[in-house]
């Protein structure tokens, strides 16, 4: 199910569409370094492509089960897992507000956590290697 991210079918004439959005080089020549880019199209791919959406749901599901009583602990776990640092209190409160809003919209608990995980995975800090 999650192998799509590992095993992507490449053609020399037309690369995978998601790879084009992330500025993957053509396979016609070897490139030592990739360019660092961050475009709105990349965010659109990360929000809508099943290749990114399904892992976000799985991450949200794990974070939800970290501590069912205190969602802030689940958010902190997810933050450490994705960004390798502790979240600030402002970051935790924003994600708690997002969880509350998503629950009020009528989404289930699992879907609300999936949206929160998607937000973390779409952060520039997660996408861009520095």
Label each residue range with its predicted role.
Residues 63-117:
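C-terminal structured "cap/appendage" subdomains that terminate the fold
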Residues 1-74, 109-130:
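An acidic, gly/pro-interrupted, aromatic-rich
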């Amino acid at each position: 199910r999650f192998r799509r991210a590992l095993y992507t079918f490449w053609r020399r004439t037309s690369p995978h569409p998601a790879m084009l959005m992330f500025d993957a080089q053509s396979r016609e020549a070897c490139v030592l370094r990739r360019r660092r880019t961050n475009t709105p199209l990349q965010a659109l791919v990360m929000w809508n492509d099943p290749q990114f959406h399904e892992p976000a749901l799985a991450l949200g599901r794990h974070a939800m089960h970290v501590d069912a009583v205190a969602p802030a602990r689940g958010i902190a776990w997810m933050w450490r897992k994705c960004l390798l640092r502790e979240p600030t209190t402002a970051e935790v409160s924003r994600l708690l507000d997002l969880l509350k809003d998503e629950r009020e919209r009528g989404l289930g608990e699992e879907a609300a956590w999936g949206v929160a995980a998607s937000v973390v995975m779409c952060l520039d800090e997660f996408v861009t290697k520095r």
